[in-house]
Amino acid sequence: MRRLFFTICFCLPLIVCCGNGTDTLSSAQIFSLEEREGVEQRIVMPPLPQKASFAGEEVPLQYFDVRESLLRELTTITHWHGSLMYIMQLAGRYRGMVEKVLEEEGLHPDFFYLCVAESSLQPATSPAGAKGYWQFLASTAKEFGLEINSQVDERFNWEKSTRAACKYLKKAYEKYGTWTLAAASYNIGMANIDDRIGYQNIRNYYDMQLPLETARYVFRAIAFKTIMSNPRAYGFYLKKSDIFKPIELKEVFVDYSIANWSDFAAKHNTNFKMIKMFNEWIRSNHLDNKYKKRYKVLVPAEDARSMQ
């Protein structure tokens, strides 16, 4: 691969500079670079599992359209090499935080992979304005009890946003009777699922015709589960030392105003960067807590940053 890389890098300037002349490389000559001795470049389809499930519900792989949908997501995700490696590293640090809340709320641990599909375990913002680890729109976030203002955005709070997502999913499950359709509604909204049930007379995610994004959505979570449960089967060889370790954190409860978060950090033998890393819900350099609300701030232990 290295030899091919440097050969192409050398040839590309010639192609660009001589584009209007007679000495340009033909398509056949360019593609023949891959056939030289010692050069190997293979892209193969990822393996499709014989069985799959999500949240305890079997994926009907006996249907060709279901197999093809899952294979599409497996193929897409496994070829995001760097992104997927980083997600698997982050999972070592944050999976426990998410699964603890899922267990407390009575939800299947597979919903961790829905969080992966939503945000790649990062404090993301979508073009549509959905934010945080679970990608809530502001209106839905407030409906499920999350605080959003110029100083606090609990969509970026691991625990609170996960609990809000659990509330939504349990409400949707009570309405639809399957976790996969509840998960689909998390992407498109219950009103849109209701419309499709009305005119399709279908209450099964795998049988329902849906917009492309939602049609792919649950399959994406299933694909993440499949790959991350057995990464070596998909060509990803991470050593134990490659995975990010959970950071030892202490809980500090704040029911007062904070004039400057950096001063707060210094009092706890850390800095604002470390405070923000584990409390992305902090959206300002201060907190006007005039109603004395009780916030939980995660503070790294004194020697946590130096851990090996």
Language-model regions, residue ranges each:
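Substrate-binding/active-site groove segments that recognize
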Residues: 129-150, 162-164, 169, 193-196
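An acidic, Gly/Ser/Thr/Pro-rich helix-cap/linker signature
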Residues: 4-5, 13-106
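Extracellular LysM carbohydrate-binding repeats and other cell-envelope/extracellular binding modules
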Residues: 278-308
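Solvent-exposed, acidic/flexible segments
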Residues: 80, 84-95, 104-107, 126-134, ...
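LysM (lysin motif) carbohydrate-binding repeats in extracellular/periplasmic proteins that recognize
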Residues: 260-289
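Catalytic and binding regions of secreted/periplasmic enzymes and modules that target cell-wall glycans
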Residues: 169-196
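Primarily a LysM-type cell-wall glycan-binding module
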Residues: 239-269, 293
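Short, functionally critical alpha-helical segments immediately adjacent to catalytic or ligand/cofactor-binding
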Residues: 107-122, 182-188, 275-278
